[in-house]
């Protein structure tokens, strides 16, 4: 059962291949994504994050979800030596982590319903669980950032998450906090991890690091990466090819 919506201004796809799949469970995940969008969208003037940025919401009045996300952002900043930083010129923007977090939390809803085979995707960031309709691993294409209609790599996933960071993507403006400027050394980096939340936050940080970001991913246990540079050349971590065979 495959369903698609537009949420957060992005395409959202949920595909459950278990035979007992029902719309009610999938709609619950969509509702959760709407809830996250209302809290964290920097485009909505009445979102919780917008209220915070305008100084209209004191810390003591922040929701538990907001407090959790901001805490996770601070932890990620420390883990990435400051390259993951949600403070951009005085504005708080946790979008480099929220999408992956939302997808991962959404998959927990499906798991609680007893589903084991599904994928959940928001604009290319995916959590893939179990197997597809053919009983095989899920196939995920990596777009060519120079030609979005072209797939340059196909990876095979089960019980993994994948996320891509790149300034060619909608709404992506990743800052290099070390230079206090927009990160522009590379075009994109795709990260495979144990779940999409982890992949998303580290992909954001690795992109901000520029060319050395692939070395950062190489050093993370359980993660692999694929980087496309400005000259259209690509480099990957040592274990990335395991997912392309």
Each model region followed by its residue ranges:
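Mature catalytic core of soluble alpha/beta enzymes
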Residues: 1-245
């Amino acid at each position: 059962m495959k369903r698609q919506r537009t949420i957060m201004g992005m395409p959202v796809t949920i595909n459950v291949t278990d035979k007992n799949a029902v719309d009610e469970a999938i709609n619950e995940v969509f509702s959760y994504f709407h809830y996250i969008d209302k809290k964290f969208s920097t485009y909505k003037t009445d979102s919780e994050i917008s209220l915070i940025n305008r100084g209209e919401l004191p810390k003591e009045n922040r929701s538990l979800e907001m407090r959790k996300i901001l805490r996770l952002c601070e932890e990620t900043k420390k883990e990435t030596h400051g390259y993951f930083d949600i403070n951009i010129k005085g504005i708080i923007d946790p979008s480099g982590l929220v999408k992956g977090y939302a997808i991962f939390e959404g998959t927990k809803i499906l798991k609680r319903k007893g589903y084991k085979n599904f994928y959940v995707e928001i604009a290319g960031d995916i959590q893939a669980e179990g197997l597809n309709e053919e009983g095989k691993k899920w196939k995920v294409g990596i777009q060519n950032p120079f030609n979005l209609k072209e797939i340059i790599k196909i990876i095979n996933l089960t019980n993994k998450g994948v996320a891509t960071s790149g300034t060619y993507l909608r709404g992506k403006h990743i800052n290099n906090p070390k230079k206090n400027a927009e990160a522009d050394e590379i075009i994109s980096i795709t990260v495979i991890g144990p779940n999409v939340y982890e992949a998303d936050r580290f992909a954001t940080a690795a992109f901000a690091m520029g060319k050395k970001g692939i070395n950062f991913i190489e050093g993370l246990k359980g993660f692999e990466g694929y980087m496309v540079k400005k000259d259209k050349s690509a480099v990957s971590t040592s274990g990335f090819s395991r997912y392309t065979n």
